[in-house]
């Protein structure tokens, strides 16, 4: 082995008597678990001789380093801290020699600084008139005792010269005061207990031989009369419920405690059984029957007869003793506040109604203005004006503003119908003239009876056909998803007709009805045709412009 740090190392040597020359015999003698147990159970033999000198791994190394030894380091540390402690004690001794404990001097009565002030305070305590020897002696003793107590305890907590938290004497004084107070309180608490024990002693001596005697004694002497609270009388507290209030359902119930004079007395409150209730009801019904027969009118045959004299008991009122109900005229402040609130609400409602009426009047005026403008536009239309295309939305005129306009609209509609022409051809010229006057509103009451001519023209015994009338659909209109295909839905929308209820109420029966919506079928071919027409129109327009000599922007392909 190579040497490290000039120290030779060697492999450990085998113990004495161990021979490993024959490896075959070593392999044959294998140890088992039993051999291992025996080895564990046999005690270790004491060494007969010293360990061999060749094994040097337990020896101290040649060069000993004191810093690496933990015991040496511990000793050094102890000596260092001992020196520090000694220096600290010496410093405290020096400070104690220079420091003067004035509080200790004051407690011992050796304080030189307060000698002059004590003389002044003691001379002020003496009286002007010389007292007797005994009084002087007792006063001096008391004064000396007070001085000593003030020196030791420091006087009262508020006026003491001791510092709270620094002087131990003040803490002792406060503790003594707290202990004395607690003792006094305990004595006060124990006094009534002792007195009650003294009172109970003679009673405890009583012995009862029977249960009956014990019960009699308890009922006579031990039963305590219950103190009645005058506030809790039967029927004194009642719930106040305002039936006129809008928020009566959610209002918090308020309680009212009535005065004793208003409360019903116990004598007045009679407990009625079921029989008494039935009897009272029967008497009430009989009294009603008597009053009803007396107030009936006499028949013709009984008019001449004199009224039979009734016994005085029949007219007696069973509720004679009960006085009439006198309502209180004064209202509570809460009722007054509610009345004011309701008045304010009524005024607001009136103002709102007025505003609504004004708005309606304005709307009516606007409608009349629009109707006049439409009439003027119709008059201005020329004969050769283009008809409206199907794609353009049709303006549905609103109802007429007055009865005259309603009659005019009826005349215009019926003048173009075939049935009306047939009836006109059958009539005489005089009737035509009268009818013209009738529709012209020259001399008739048609304004008051707007449906008169309508009833004359279309009156029949058959029932009116209400199949086309728009009676309203509670489930809502049919939509796209109520049909299987788009074609069925478009066919339904094209054929859908509905007449307003007003037409049936006023007697106007339209032949074809009104289509609710202009639903047009859109297919690819129609769309392509429309686009081709637009493109061809643009091309024609450009050709005309080129022919006229106008420069046209040419697209780049």
Curated annotation (Swiss-Prot):
Keyword Methyltransferase: no
Sequence repeat start and end residues: 342-343, 344-345, 346-347, 348-349, 350-351, 352-353, 354-355, 356-357, 358-359, 360-361, 362-363, 364-365, 366-367, 368-369, 370-371, 372-373, 374-375
Keywords: Acetylation, Chromosome, Cytoplasm, Cytoskeleton, Isopeptide bond, mRNA processing, mRNA splicing, Nucleus, Phosphoprotein, Repeat, Spliceosome, Ubl conjugation
GO cellular component, one term: mitotic spindle pole
Ranges of biased composition (kind: Basic residues): 294-303
Superkingdom of origin organism: Eukaryota
Biased segments, Basic and acidic residues type: 16-25, 304-313, 332-398
Subcellular locations according to the entry: Nucleus; Nucleus, Nucleoplasm; Chromosome; Cytoplasm, Cytoskeleton, Spindle pole
Any GO BP annotation: mitotic spindle assembly checkpoint signaling
Assembly notes: Component of the spliceosome B complex. Interacts with SMU1. Interacts with MAD1L1. May interact with DHX15.
Function per UniProt: Involved in pre-mRNA splicing as a component of the spliceosome. Auxiliary spliceosomal protein that regulates selection of alternative splice sites in a small set of target pre-mRNA species. Required for normal mitotic cell cycle progression. Recruits MAD1L1 and MAD2L1 to kinetochores, and is required to trigger the spindle assembly checkpoint. Required for normal accumulation of SMU1.
Name this protein carries in UniProt: Protein Red
Lineage, broadest ranks: Eukaryota, Metazoa, Chordata, Craniata, Vertebrata
Gene that encodes the chain: IK
């Amino acid at each position: 082995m190579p040497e490290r740090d000039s120290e030779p190392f060697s492999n450990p040597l085998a113990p004495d008597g161990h021979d490993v020359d024959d490896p075959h015999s070593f392999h044959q003698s294998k140890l088992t678990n039993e051999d291992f147990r025996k080895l564990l159970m046999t005690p270790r033999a004491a060494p007969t001789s010293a360990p061999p000198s060749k094994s040097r791994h337990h020896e101290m190394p040649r060069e000993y380093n004191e810093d690496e030894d933990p015991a040496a380091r511990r000793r050094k540390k102890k000596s260092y801290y001992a020196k520090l402690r000694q220096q600290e004690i010496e410093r405290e001794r020096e400070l104690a020699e220079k420091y003067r404990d004035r509080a200790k001097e004051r407690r011992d009565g050796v304080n030189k600084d307060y000698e002059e002030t004590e003389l002044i305070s003691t001379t002020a305590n003496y009286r002007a008139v010389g007292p007797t020897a005994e009084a002087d002696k007792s006063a001096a003793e008391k004064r000396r005792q007070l001085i000593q107590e003030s020196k030791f305890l420091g006087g009262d907590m508020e006026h003491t010269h001791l510092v709270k938290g620094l002087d131990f004497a003040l803490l002792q004084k406060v503790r003594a005061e707290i202990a004395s107070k607690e003792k006094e309180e305990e004595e006060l608490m124990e006094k009534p207990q002792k007195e009650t024990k003294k009172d109970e002693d003679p009673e405890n001596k009583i012995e009862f031989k029977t249960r009956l005697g014990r019960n009699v004694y308890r009922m006579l002497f031990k039963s305590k009369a219950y103190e009645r609270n005058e506030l809790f009388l039967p029927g004194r507290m009642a719930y106040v419920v305002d039936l006129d209030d809008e928020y009566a359902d959610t209002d918090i119930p308020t309680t009212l405690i009535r005065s004793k004079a208003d409360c019903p007395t116990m004598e007045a409150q009679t407990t009625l059984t079921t029989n008494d209730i039935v009897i009272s009801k029967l008497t009430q019904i009989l009294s009603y029957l008597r009053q009803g027969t007396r107030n009936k009118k006499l028949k013709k045959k009984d008019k001449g007869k004199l009224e039979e004299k009734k016994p005085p008991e029949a007219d007696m009122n069973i509720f004679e003793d009960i006085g009439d109900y006198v309502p209180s005229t004064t209202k509570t402040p809460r009722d007054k506040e509610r009345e004011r609130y309701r008045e304010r609400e009524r005024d607001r409602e009136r103002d709102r109604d007025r505003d609504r009426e004004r708005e309606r009047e304005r709307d009516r005026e606007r409608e009349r203005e629009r109707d006049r403008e439409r009439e003027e536009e119709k008059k201005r239309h020329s004969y050769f004006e283009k008809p409206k295309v199907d794609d353009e939305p049709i303006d549905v005129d609103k109802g007429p503003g007055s009865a005259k306009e309603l009659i005019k609209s009826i005349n215009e509609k019926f003048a173009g119908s075939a049935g009306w022409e047939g009836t006109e051809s059958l009539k005489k010229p005089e009737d035509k003239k009268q009818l013209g006057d009738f529709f012209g509103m020259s001399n008739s009451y048609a304004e008051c009876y707007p449906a008169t001519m309508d009833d004359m023209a279309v009156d029949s015994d058959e029932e009116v056909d209400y199949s086309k009338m728009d009676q309203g659909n509670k489930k809502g209109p049919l939509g796209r998803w109520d049909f299987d295909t788009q074609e069925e839905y478009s066919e339904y929308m094209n054929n859908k007709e509905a007449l307003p209820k007003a037409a049936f109420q006023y007697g106007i029966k339209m032949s074809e009805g009104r289509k609710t919506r202009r639903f047009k079928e859109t297919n690819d071919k129609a769309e392509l045709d429309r686009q081709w027409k637009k493109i061809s129109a643009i091309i024609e327009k450009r050709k005309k412009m080129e022919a006229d000599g106008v420069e046209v922007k040419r697209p780049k392909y």
